[in-house]
Amino acid sequence: MGKVVGIDLGTTNSCVSVMEGGKPTVIANAEGFRTTPSVVAYTKNQDQLVGQIAKRQAVMNPDNTFYSVKRFIGRRVDEVNEESKEVSYGVEKAGSNVKVKCPVLDKQFAPEEVSAQVLRKLAEDAGKYLGETVTQAVITVPAYFNDSQRQATKDAGKIAGLEVLRIINEPTAAALAYGLDKKSNERILVFDLGGGTFDVSVLEVGDGVFEVLSTSGDTHLGGDDFDKVIVDHLAETFKSNEGIDLRQDKQALQRLTEAAEKAKIELSSATQSEINLPFITATPEGPKHLDLTLTRAKFEELAANLIDRCRIPVEQALKDAKLSSSELDEIVMVGGSTRIPAVLELVKRTTSKDPNQTVNPDEVVAVGAAIQGGVLAGEVKDILLLDVTPLSLGVETLGGVMTKMITRNTTVPTKKTETYSTAVDGQTNVEIHVLQGEREMASDNKSLGTFRLDGIPPAPRGVPQIEVTFDIDANGILSVTAKDKGSGKEQSISITGASTLSDSEVDKMVKDAEANASADKEKREKIDLKNQAETLVYQAEKQMGELGDKVEADAKAKVDEKRTKLQEAINAEDYDAMKTLLEELQQELYTVGASVYQQEGAAAGGAAPGGDAGASAASGGGDASDDVIDAEFTETK
């Protein structure tokens, strides 16, 4: 099998890594950076941009620039009411699912499709580094992602043309990277605060065994929320001074968001940050500017509620692991948002331990995913990973109650069977409502979907016996099987109605992505060809001017003719002619260059007998491979 890459598909930034020579290596993207912004944009020319280049143009193109899409993946519209208000692009309902609106293409995208473009770029950049096509990956997800979100992430990989060998929890991946060389047993708590999600996992690591004892988290808490409190502060301050709410203007909102992120980062190392946004808006009186100083103390005051929310999952994870903070050996900090001083202080206060900041918080998750990829590919030996399901799974029973079949923090993979019966006499079918969550009432938990089992022989209520089996694989993804013991009927049930895509939708998106990838490649090749042609036209003109009379008239005329024709092909965007004329002009320039060198060589040969000692010394003695010393000669007349 080929190389298996590990991908951290983040809310804000993503990262890709691979095992090389038994060690994980983070792969830089085509732009030379080790992390890639999880941003996809479409320009007015309908060109697709991914990564840094997409992020840079967001202010001028807020409607068609998609970021923080991970917060929508695998979710229903009614689950993302707050998140949808915080982005500059349109978030729409498609059935019960979420779609993002792209006005310039006049179409909607599923979050999986947008994430797939980020995954595709990471895989392509990794392929260029490795010198082979990347087709297999391990992709990370927040530990607290539910079944729908995990399945949606796997679908995104499929749309990107990747075989997703494993979905692995982000804190577990970080623990793999941290504990790979640990021989002695350690109990560690991984505190993972990323751009859009927050996870806490407690693990026992040592001698190649990584056992997750518990996990907790909040999928509605991350760096984006810290940015938002700054955005709101800036907007409210400006509104009180000028009477204008900048959040109603998409371009202004995008500028505020970028300024907030920059200020948040600065405040991790400085005690105050200057925020200057000239020409943020305009009124009949003229342009308006935003100029404000944000102190670290004010930021911590604004974010106090968010910081306090980080405490609850830590306490819950320790409680579920049946450990006290004094029994922990290390607190491993993961995710860019853990650089916030108030977050570090909270961890220290809650656990009475200094956080371990030896790992790179932006890269460690991808590194762990690469290690897991190495395990699956057989490159890494003697690693045993025991992960858990983050949320309880069950079914709705009589009275709207959730009956749990698999409780949270159960080691996966796992399988559990329960027997249920009918609620009324003569019932020939049952509808089973599959749920995920911790609340007592079905309506308060996440609905993963419903299915019907038909063909039950009529009988008094309570007599039929229906076996329902929940099976969670190593990815944490659920499948359900039902069997009527009376009739012997057994069938695997595909859960429908969940906030994920159907197989046919995924297949269609795979084909669309492949077609678009081909079209994008062709478009890039044309742009590269045009750039080469324009460069050569400029070089030809410059070269002819510099050489002047040294070029024979016939040769110069041929170069000028080819250069003019190539310029005409560029203007007409005739790419076939461009390719041919590019090669022809290059050939003419090679001929001119060779002719000029021959002339100079002949002139030099004729001058040698004249007794120029310096020239004789430089060109005379010895091997052609001898060092050549640069020198200036003055011609004596």
Swiss-Prot record:
Keywords, in A-Z order: ATP-binding, Chaperone, Nucleotide-binding, Phosphoprotein, Stress response
SUPFAM superfamilies associated with the record: Actin-like ATPase domain, Heat shock protein 70kD (HSP70), C-terminal subdomain, Heat shock protein 70kD (HSP70), peptide-binding domain
Biased composition (Acidic residues): 624-637
Induction pattern: By stress conditions e.g. heat shock.
Compositionally skewed regions (Gly residues) per UniProt: 603-623
Tree of life domain: Bacteria
UniProt keyword ATP-binding, yes or no: yes
GO molecular function, one term: ATP binding
Positions bearing Phosphothreonine: T197
Record region (Disordered): 602-637
Gene3D superfamilies per the UniProt record, alphabetical: 1.20.1270.10, 3.30.420.40, Actin, Chain A, domain 4, Substrate Binding Domain Of DNAk, Chain A, domain 1
Family label: Belongs to the heat shock protein 70 family.
Identification of the protein by name: Chaperone protein dnaK2
Species for this entry: Parasynechococcus marenigrum (strain WH8102)
Lineage, broadest ranks: Bacteria, Bacillati, Cyanobacteriota, Cyanophyceae, Synechococcales
Gene name of this polypeptide: dnaK2
